[in-house]
Amino acid sequence: MIGRLNHVAIAVPDLQAASAQYEHTLGAVVGPPQDEPDHGVTVVFIELPNTKIELLYPLGDDSPIKGFLEKNPSGGIHHICYEVEDILAARDRLKEQGARVLGSVEPKIGAHGKPVLFLHPKDFNGCLIELEQV
């Protein structure tokens, strides 16, 4: 069901500093900041030859990343994202097997302009999973 690893998301306390580190220290191709108000984050994508890194920074007081950074002030890996061909079929199959979908269970449009869902980390060995339709 899951396909390619789309990205690894890292919550950061300083988006500008983290972007500069990836660009200047690691020599990666770093995109511009992009506000995603429906998800309460500002994101920056870093293009790698085989996948992407998504830097996450809180957008607004209700941002889920704000709480993550309060618990992890230095930042850290927040979630991993896998591609799926049919997000509704994937959701239904996972729910039948007992997996919990976070939020309203209906896909939202993600930072790439495609439908996404998040799966509860308690159902996946402590890892928050994002599914993105390709």
Task: Give the positions of each predicted feature.
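A contiguous binding-surface segment within folded domains or other stable secondary-structure elements
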Residues: 49-66
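Active-site segment of metal-dependent pyrophosphate-handling enzymes
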Residues: 40-42
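A structural feature that tracks compact, well-ordered secondary-structure segments
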Residues: 9-15, 21, 54-57, 81-83, ...
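Vicinal oxygen chelate
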Residues: 5-13, 44-47, 54, 67-134
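A cross-kingdom feature marking solvent-exposed beta-strand/loop segments within repeated
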Residues: 4-6, 19, 23-38, 61-72, ...
